[in-house]
Amino acid sequence: MTKRAPKSGPLSPSCSGGSSRNLELAVKSSEGARRSTRLRLQPLRKPKTSPKKKPVKLQTKMPKKPATAFFFFLDDFRKQYQEENPDVKSMREIGKTCGEKWKTMTYEEKVKYYDIATEKREEFHRAMTEYTKRMESGAHDESETDSDYSE
């Protein structure tokens, strides 16, 4: 009684077909996974390339926010600076020198512009309260007129 040793030689192509088929399926499934992720990513990219935003309705009767103290200073400084330096036309240059001047000014020098800004801010708050009252009363009037026309 002799024992036979298992075959440890190279496998024939017909025998390896089953295992290669498994490998092919594994490769195909991973390609499918890559393809599916690509398909999922493509719709996410489309809105970035061509974003179409809805037009924002601007309420033209709404009061505009007031400028800060620095902008009131900028107006005065720009006029004075252009008179002294007519050759400088660049707003960048004017803005840069204005910012430097504003930083070096003392509080006492800035008070004038802070006062103007607070006055404008108070006017804005008054105008906003009037505007909100008009909008609230106007909204109720519009709803009543809409109901009259719908009958």
Swiss-Prot record:
Residues 35-56 have a biased composition (Basic residues). Its main location: nucleus. It is found in: Nucleus. Residues 132-142 have a biased composition (Basic and acidic residues). The modification Phosphoserine is found at S150. One of its GO terms (biological process) is chromatin organization. Residues 63-132 bind DNA. Pfam families: HMG_box. CDD domains: HMG-box_AtHMGB1-like (cd22005). SUPFAM superfamilies: HMG-box. Keywords: DNA-binding, Nucleus, Phosphoprotein. GO terms for molecular function: chromatin binding; DNA binding; DNA-binding transcription factor activity; structural constituent of chromatin. Residues 7-20 have a biased composition (Low complexity). Residues 1-62, 132-151 are annotated as: Disordered. One of its GO terms (cellular component) is chromatin. It comes from the Eukaryota. Belongs to the HMGB family. This is High mobility group B protein 14. It comes from Arabidopsis thaliana (Mouse-ear cress).
